[in-house]
């Protein structure tokens, strides 16, 4: 039968599995668990109530829809600077301040410098745009025009998440190894102007940094069914595995991760992908209030915003603390699309049943997690609860290397096999029994 792997127990179980496989000593595992506990404590400072106050402020009529370059847009920028000014972050804009002006618009940039001198010049960016469409017009609104478009979800929700992440960074007892830049983009609704400007003209405090990763938050305020869309997971090998691992530290509150392969110029993550920088975007989906005056505060799912912001924070820390060199950009992501994804994940026609009743396909970006595309009826796999779309990540406590390794391991197995599978971003334990 299928069984979800609960939160703190998931960490302990994985530690035990690693130790049983001849992995790190109990001292190392104890240190890792202590670090996970400190990270969880910092993430716990990201709170729905605090985020809600920022959403309510930014989506107030007084900001007149936060159009880039407008009076309301500039007032929104001033609000953000006031919210982060006391957090001990370094201003990373021009002239010693947080602002990076361009035209009549302003990005807002705040730096948490890394703790390891050998990699502190490597920059992980966590970003979101703070502008919206003002009163709306035929080019940027679905109407009615002439009314304040408050943009509570788009993107006061993402900005609130960023401010909460800034506070969580200050709650960490020690900074991560790499530096983290919090970037609030202006001009996104006018064509990703702020992120493009930043990539073309780096402010003086950041000119000696190398951007190694970007996480973008856009419209994270309408979580439905615990499902968050994840874009960019194909921009570097193993990004799905990374986000799944981070997500499952939350245990019972782990979100359903809906990975989408498409890459469209619809938010600031696109500018970084164009520059061949590995990038993720978290997004809770479009809705009928998108770019309408009705995108208002009372519709925002604040507990959901809290969950997505905590996931983004923990992902940023995981990347910033990685011992390995920066993740490479995966050029093949540009040639992949929704149809490529459907081809990989499509159910396979019936074939030879085999001992366990499992058919899989290998994923070039995640070879260590073969995709289940066939489960034979009345097979050990079917009886154990394996379903099409699951990704097999571990067999009997040992992580897989690739599909060939999986086939070998299953061929050598006894009458029982315990698997850990990634099911839409949640880790599930499956037990297969060979009833021959």
What positions do the PLM features span?
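A non-catalytic alpha/beta surface segment that caps or lines the substrate-entry region
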Residues: 57, 66-113
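His/Asp/Glu-rich mid-to-C-terminal helical/loop segments that flank catalytic regions of hydrolases
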Residues: 171, 288-337
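Metal-dependent peptidase/peptidase-like ectodomains
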Residues: 185-287, 301
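Acidic/His- and Gly-rich active-site-bordering loop/insert found
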Residues: 58, 84, 102-140
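PDZ/PDZ-like groove recognition
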Residues: 334-388
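Alpha-helical metal-binding/catalytic segments enriched in His/Glu/Asp
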Residues: 110, 126-128, 132, 137-192, ...
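PDZ-domain C-terminal substructure recognizer with occasional recognition of PDZ-binding tails
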Residues: 387, 393, 407-436
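Conserved PDZ fold ligand-binding element
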Residues: 381-404
């Amino acid at each position: 039968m299928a069984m979800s792997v609960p939160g703190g127990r998931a960490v302990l179980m994985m530690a035990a599995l690693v130790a049983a496989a001849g992995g790190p000593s109990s001292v190392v595992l104890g240190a890792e668990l202590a670090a996970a506990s400190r990270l969880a404590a910092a993430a716990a400072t990201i709170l729905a109530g605090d985020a809600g106050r920022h959403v309510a402020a930014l989506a107030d009529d007084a900001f007149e829809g936060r159009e880039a370059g407008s009076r309301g847009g500039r007032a929104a920028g001033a609000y953000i600077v006031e919210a982060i000014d006391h957090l001990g972050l370094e201003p990373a804009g021009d002239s010693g301040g947080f602002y990076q002006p361009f035209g009549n618009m302003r990005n807002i940039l705040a730096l948490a410098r890394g703790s390891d001198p050998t990699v502190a010049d490597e920059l992980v960016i966590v970003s979101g745009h703070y502008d919206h469409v003002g009163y709306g017009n035929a080019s940027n609104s679905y109407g009615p025009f002439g009314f304040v478009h408050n943009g509570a979800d788009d993107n006061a929700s993402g900005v609130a998440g960023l401010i909460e992440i800034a506070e969580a960074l200050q709650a960490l007892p020690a900074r991560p190894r790499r530096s983290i830049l919090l970037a609030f983009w202006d001009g996104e609704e006018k064509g990703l102007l702020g992120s493009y400007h930043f990539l073309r003209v780096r402010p003086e405090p950041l000119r000696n940094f190398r951007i190694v990763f970007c996480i973008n938050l856009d419209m994270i305020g309408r979580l439905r069914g615990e499902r968050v869309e994840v874009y960019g997971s194909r921009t570097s090998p193993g990004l799905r595995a990374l986000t799944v691992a981070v997500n499952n530290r939350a245990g019972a509150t782990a979100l359903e991760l809906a990975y989408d392969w498409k890459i469209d110029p619809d938010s600031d993550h696109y500018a970084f992908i164009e520059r061949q920088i590995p990038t993720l975007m978290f997004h809770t989906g479009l809705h009928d209030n998108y770019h309408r005056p009705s995108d208002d505060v009372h519709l925002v799912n604040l507990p959901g915003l809290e969950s997505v912001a905590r996931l983004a924070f923990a992902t940023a820390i995981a990347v910033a603390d990685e011992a390995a060199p920066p993740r490479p950009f995966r050029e093949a992501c540009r040639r992949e699309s929704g149809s490529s994804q459907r081809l990989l994940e499509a159910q396979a026609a019936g074939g030879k049943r085999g001992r366990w009743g499992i058919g899989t396909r290998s994923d070039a970006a995640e070879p260590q997690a073969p995709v289940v595309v066939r489960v034979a009826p009345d097979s050990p796999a079917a009886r154990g609860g394996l379903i099409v779309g699951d990704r097999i990540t571990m067999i009997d406590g040992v992580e897989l290397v690739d599909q060939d390794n999986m086939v070998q391991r299953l061929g050598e197995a006894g009458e029982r096999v315990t698997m850990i599978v990634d099911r839409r971003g949640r880790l599930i334990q499956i037990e297969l029994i060979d009833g021959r």
